[in-house]
């Protein structure tokens, strides 16, 4: 009887140990399954986020204009926030680009006006005169008459007319009354010259970016503004008898 009691006690202890092992194993399996589910959910959310980001990135690339179009709605121009949602806003951007293109052309006239009229820069006048004479000689060679005496008379008359011209008199007076500028005046003039070299290029490249939006409204604003500005600048140069400088490569 005592043996049976001991045997029953051993059986009870083994059953309790087995149940403890089983419960521990099930707990470990539950933790592993929970970890796997969390990992899968996080990977799924990250993949979905990447997919959405890729779709947004692709849609932004698809929205870029690759040819001339009349569509302008919510399309950025040069800056991120410079865009038009209505026709009135598009017209406002048109006026802005027209004014910038016009001003870029007029700055060339301002530079020539300051050098020749305001500052009376003799070196600038001589360089511009040499460029204009050289281009004139390349384009139209002198025509010789039948008689040498007549040709000499024509050349002498032209030289006399040039000497008696008001531009020649102003240049001669400026050379005779030329005074050395102070250091402050020289530095201030050089700063203005530097600004008149940088600002037109800044406007030109900004207008190029605006034209590269391939929007007809903004494209014609740049073209018309630049053309009108060039026309007005040339008319003012003729009015003030300012010599034209060499043509600029940029718009």
Curated annotation (Swiss-Prot):
Positions with biased composition (Basic and acidic residues): 157-173
GO cellular component: plasma membrane
Major location category of this protein: membrane
Keyword Repressor listed: no
Membrane-crossing residue ranges in chain numbering: 90-110, 208-228
Subcellular compartments: Cell membrane
Keywords per UniProt: Cell membrane, Copper, Copper transport, Ion transport, Membrane, Transmembrane, Transmembrane helix, Transport
Listed InterPro entries: Cop_transporter
Molecular function terms from GO: copper ion transmembrane transporter activity
Protein's UniProt keywords contain Oxidoreductase: no
Region feature (Disordered): 157-176
Domain of life from the UniProt record: Eukaryota
Disrupted gene: phenotype observed: Impairs growth on solid low-copper and low-iron medium and displays altered morphology in response to copper-depleted conditions.
Gene induction: Expressed in limited copper conditions. Expression is positively controlled by MAC1 and TYE7. Induced during biofilm formation and contact with macrophages as well as by alkaline pH via RIM101. Expression is down-regulated by 17-beta-estradiol.
Membrane-related topology note: Multi-pass membrane protein
One Gene Ontology biological process: copper ion import
Function: Required for high affinity copper (probably reduced Cu I) transport into the cell.
Complexes and interactors: Oligomer.
Official protein name in the record: Copper transport protein CTR1
Species this chain originates from: Candida albicans (strain SC5314 / ATCC MYA-2876)
Taxonomic lineage of the native organism: Eukaryota, Fungi, Dikarya, Ascomycota, Saccharomycotina
